[in-house]
């Protein structure tokens, strides 16, 4: 276990947008809203982003991170995530970025727990989801749960906003305003995740899931999801 406070720089590296996990290639459904004209400027993307943080990231990724910290096995959580991530592209995005994070983490932030999870994935006994790979690394570094949640959620917000700046498109200053506003959503989500019950896992807005499913058949696409 890392000494108290010694994890900050490692956590910044782990959540940096330069970490090559492939997040730049995923809209996680907002490209469908762009195609339908529902997301078209700073304000409309901000509405989508707030809903995504408050719903999908809270009840899926965030809750999985919390449960892993509380002692639920990553094998059990991996199976639950695979089952409740209904849109195929979203499921594949989670495992592609998660598998890449496992590869990076094994070399840069090695730990017995991370090696065990990667071995399960390599043996085909787990899918290798991004939030679990992140949580295993963060916990091994000694990052407290609330900081781990906030860092993961804000990293997701940052990559999605960067992708929206390219796709809508938006100005760079607009992107920074969105990030500042989203910090309040992230703080609220961290608090909410701490209160959720096991039965809340996967309780995602159908509208978000439908948009992610429609993206598979969208004729022109910038993103893989």
Swiss-Prot record:
* Keyword Ion transport on entry: no
Keyword annotations: Chaperone, Cytoplasm, Nickel insertion
Identify the Pfam families for this entry.
Answer: UreF (PF01730)
Gene Ontology CC entries for this record: cytoplasm
Question: Which family is it part of?
Answer: Belongs to the UreF family.
**Which HAMAP family does the protein's record reference?**
UreF
Q: Which protein is depicted? A: Urease accessory protein UreF
**Organism from which the protein derives:** Arthrobacter sp. (strain FB24)
> What lineage does UniProt assign to this protein's organism?
Bacteria, Bacillati, Actinomycetota, Actinomycetes, Micrococcales
């Amino acid at each position: 276990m890392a000494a108290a406070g010694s994890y900050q720089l490692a956590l910044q590296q782990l959540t940096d947008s330069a970490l090559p996990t492939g997040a730049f290639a995923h809209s996680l459904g907002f490209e469908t809203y762009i195609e339908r004209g529902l997301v078209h400027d700073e304000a409309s993307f901000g509405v989508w982003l707030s809903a995504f943080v408050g719903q999908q990231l809270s009840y899926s990724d965030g809750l999985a991170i919390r449960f892993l910290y509380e002692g639920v096995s990553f094998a059990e959580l991996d199976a639950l995530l695979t089952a409740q991530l209904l849109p195929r592209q979203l499921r594949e995005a989670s495992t592609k970025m998660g598998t890449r994070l496992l590869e990076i983490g094994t070399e840069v932030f090695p730990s017995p727990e991370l090696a065990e999870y990667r071995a399960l994935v390599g043996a085909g006994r787990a899918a290798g989801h991004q939030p679990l790979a992140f949580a295993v690394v963060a916990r091994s570094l000694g990052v407290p749960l609330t900081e781990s949640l906030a860092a993961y959620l804000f990293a997701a917000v940052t990559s999605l906003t960067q992708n929206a700046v390219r796709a809508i498109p938006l100005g760079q200053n607009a992107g920074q305003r969105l990030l500042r506003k989203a910090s309040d959503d992230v703080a609220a989500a961290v608090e909410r995740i701490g209160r959720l019950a096991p039965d809340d896992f996967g309780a995602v807005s159908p509208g978000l899931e439908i948009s992610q499913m429609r993206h598979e058949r969208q004729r022109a696409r910038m993103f893989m999801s």
